[in-house]
Amino acid sequence: MAVQAPAERPVDEIPPLKRLLPLGFQHVLAMYAGAVAVPLIVGGAMVGAGRLQQSDIVHLIMADLFVAGIATVIQAVGFWRFGVRLPLMQGVTFAAVGPMITIGLNHGVTTIYGSVIACGLFMMALAPVFGKLIRFFPPLVTGTIILIIGVSLMRVAAGWFGGGTATGVDFGSPAAIGMGFFTLVVIIAIERFAPEGLRRVSILLGLLVGTVVAIPFGMADWSHMGDYDWVGFVTPFQFGMPAFEVSSIIALLIVAIVIMTETTGDIVAVGEIVDEKITPQRLADGLRADGLGTVIGGIFNTFPYTAFAQNVGLVAITGVRTRHVATVAGVILVLLGLLPKMAAVVEGIPLPVLGGAGVALFGMVAASGVRTLSKVAFTNTNILVVAISIGVAMLTEAKLYYTDRTLGDGPVNVSLDLYHQFPDWFQTIFHSGISAGAITAILLNLLLNTRPTDELAGDLAGHDAPRGALPDPLDALRAADPATPPQRLRQLAEDRPELRTIIVTNPATDRETCTWIREQGDEQVAAVCRKWDEVTDGRFSTRGG
């Protein structure tokens, strides 16, 4: 009798190329606007400070797409202990934007890349044990940090919206503001009236329509297109060998932890969508791939990489579970990274158009933070954590503007940052609202939400304390659903201790699992069972017997 070969898992299936190719392009389009935003932001800041030339932004865009493709292939295909082998797209994270600009302004571009390389190495080293540390980053902390990232980036969007120029002469002109709002209205219209497939790329379409409309008004400038070849190569260490400075590295190590927390959520989410169990080792493989992609990014003059959440949503919508869709998308990104003229087109998009799209894009980042915070029980303690963290982050936006008549022949306008009298190392870490807010949120959560068990039992904020793992909403729904099979409930009880109080009250949970949960000695579980026994005259503990 012939032995039947095991069925191929859906995540490993290789559909025909004619099906993979359009799906891969769909993933690229869904992430493209977010992927190129970071090199435009950081590159623009470095050009304004005289650290880079305008033409260097083309190289940053090429390098960003090229390494994003490599990192995506590593994550989807995998080798040895690198890659979660799921349909995950990799792109540059917004979390590092503020710290990198601060590092570049204070220490130069090469120090950015030295810090990025150190950040990636740190992520690879931390990957095997990060699952044990994630309890220190509950939704209260991660949601606050993501909200701060979105709010901090809005300043960049405002500069673009006004058509920010080096001289500031035309800044805030009615034409620029009008074009910014036009682009924003186009994005809103697409979200309201377009089919689902187009809504997934609403920001990219808004950029396209806004740019086309801006051309007759003379806002688009592609006069330099002839300076670039059709095909080019990304050069490692193009701006010089990386420099390593301690405070700059510390600033990005804080970002690294935020990146790993974000990627963990994406890996767990996509694992649920494609019905793949995420073991601690598999999670470590995915985080290690994030770190490797970040190291490669530092070598090729780009930035830290993370899984892109918008593509996780696309996997759920399309229902295509094969990881090779991401593989094809990664190859497409690598090819786009070899096209200088394509990067030059992006670099030439009018700033007001970028501003309109940026308001939507960065606002969506902030809204993602609000969505994460919706899982939090807002006691006075947790409100205080969020409020102070955002407040400390926004302090970095404070500037003193005055006219100094002693610096030259005439009056000179001067601006001073809040921390301008502090040492360079302090400014590098705390000048960015993102890193300052992240440090504050982590420390306040540890200080205010770490209390004895008896206090937590009476506090609605108990589930946000750092003693618990970051809960996944899909797992929580399964834990409470009476239709969930008993075997799945037992598996959840073993894998997700923070869900045991839910599982023990699920009528579908068999008596053996309930007994096992109670034997683990969790005081919260015991308190729940006692309460139900009081209500049911003892029938709760003997059900199913």
Each PLM stretch: what is its role?
Residues 59-60, 81-95, 135-144, 198-204, ...:
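Short, non-helical or kinked segments that cap or interrupt transmembrane helices
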Residues 23-66, 75, 82-108:
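Transmembrane helix-boundary motif of multi-pass solute transporters/channels
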Residues 2-14, 187-189, 203-252, 418-428, ...:
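Hydrophobic transmembrane alpha-helices of multi-pass solute/ion transporters
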Residues 2, 35-39, 43, 183-193, ...:
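Juxtamembrane interface elements at the cytosolic ends of transmembrane helices
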Residues 18-35, 172-184, 202, 215-217, ...:
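Hydrophobic, membrane-embedded alpha-helices of multi-pass small-molecule transporters
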Residues 470-545:
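Alpha-helical scaffold segments
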Residues 12, 17, 43-85, 251-323:
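Membrane-embedded helical hairpins/re-entrant loop segments and their flanking transmembrane helices
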Residues 103-220, 330, 335-455:
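Membrane-embedded alpha-helical modules
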